[in-house]
C-alpha cells in the first residue's frame, strides 16, 4: 500500500463552518501563514478589533502625533494567542526588521512596518492584527476531519481589497458555497 504524503494548507483560507462553537473562530476566515508537521499558524482576517493604527502608534510613541489617515486603518483580532503582539500581512517585496517572506505575501512583526505605513512609505496594502491563531501538531487536521472548516487557496484580493464583513462570504464563494445555506449541524457521511 502506498503511503500518501500529508497535505498542508499554507497560503489557504480556513472558513469556519456555521456550527463552529468556539467564539474565537465562529464566523471567521483565517489566512494560514504556516502549516506543517509541527502545527499551524494563521491570522483571522475578518474581525476588526475596534482599534485603529493611530491608537496603536500613540501607545508606541506617546510623544508623536500619528497622521490623520492612521485613524482609518483598522487593527484586527488575529486570534487568541499572544494578543499583545502585532502581525502585519502585506504583499512581498518590502522587508522590515522582522519580515517572513511567504511567496507573494510577507508577514512583518517589527514596529518599523507600522511606522512606515503611517509615514506612507510602507506597503500599499496591508492587514494589521493583534494576536494569532495557533494549532499544535495534528490539531488542525483533527478539526478538518470533524468538518469544522472549509478550505480554499488564499486570495490577496479578499485579504486586502474587500471590507472585513464581506471576506467570509467571498472566501466561501471561491468554493461555490453560500454559508447561509449550510446547516449548523456537523456530521459524517
UniProtKB/Swiss-Prot annotation:
Disulfide linkage: none
Gene3D superfamilies (UniProt xref): VC0467-like
Transmembrane spans: none
Gene Ontology CC: cytosol
Pfam families for the chain: DUF179 (PF02622)
InterPro entries in alphabetical order: AlgH-like
Family the entry assigns: Belongs to the UPF0301 (AlgH) family.
NCBIfam families tied to this protein: PRK00228.1-1
Protein name, UniProt field: UPF0301 protein PA14_05290
Amino acid at each position: 500500500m502506498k503511503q500518501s504524503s500529508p497535505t498542508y494548507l499554507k497560503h489557504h483560507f480556513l472558513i469556519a463552518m456555521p456550527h463552529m462553537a468556539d467564539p474565537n473562530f465562529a464566523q471567521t476566515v483565517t489566512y494560514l501563514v504556516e502549516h506543517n508537521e509541527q502545527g499551524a499558524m494563521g491570522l483571522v482576517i475578518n474581525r476588526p478589533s475596534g482599534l485603529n493604527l493611530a491608537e496603536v502608534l500613540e501607545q508606541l510613541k506617546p510623544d508623536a502625533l500619528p497622521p490623520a489617515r492612521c485613524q482609518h486603518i483598522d487593527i484586527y483580532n488575529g486570534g487568541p494567542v499572544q494578543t499583545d503582539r502585532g502581525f502585519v500581512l502585506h504583499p512581498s517585496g518590502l522587508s522590515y526588521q522582522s519580515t517572513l517572506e511567504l511567496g507573494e505575501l510577507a508577514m512583518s512583526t517589527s514596529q518599523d512596518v507600522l511606522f512606515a505605513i503611517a509615514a506612507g512609505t510602507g506597503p500599499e496594502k496591508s492587514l494589521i492584527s493583534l494576536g494569532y491563531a495557533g494549532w499544535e501538531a495534528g490539531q488542525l487536521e483533527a478539526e478538518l476531519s470533524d468538518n469544522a472548516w472549509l478550505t480554499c487557496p488564499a486570495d490577496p484580493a479578499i485579504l486586502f481589497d474587500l471590507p472585513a464583513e464581506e471576506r467570509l462570504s467571498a472566501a466561501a464563494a471561491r468554493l461555490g458555497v453560500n454559508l447561509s445555506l449550510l446547516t449548523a449541524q456537523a456530521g459524517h457521511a
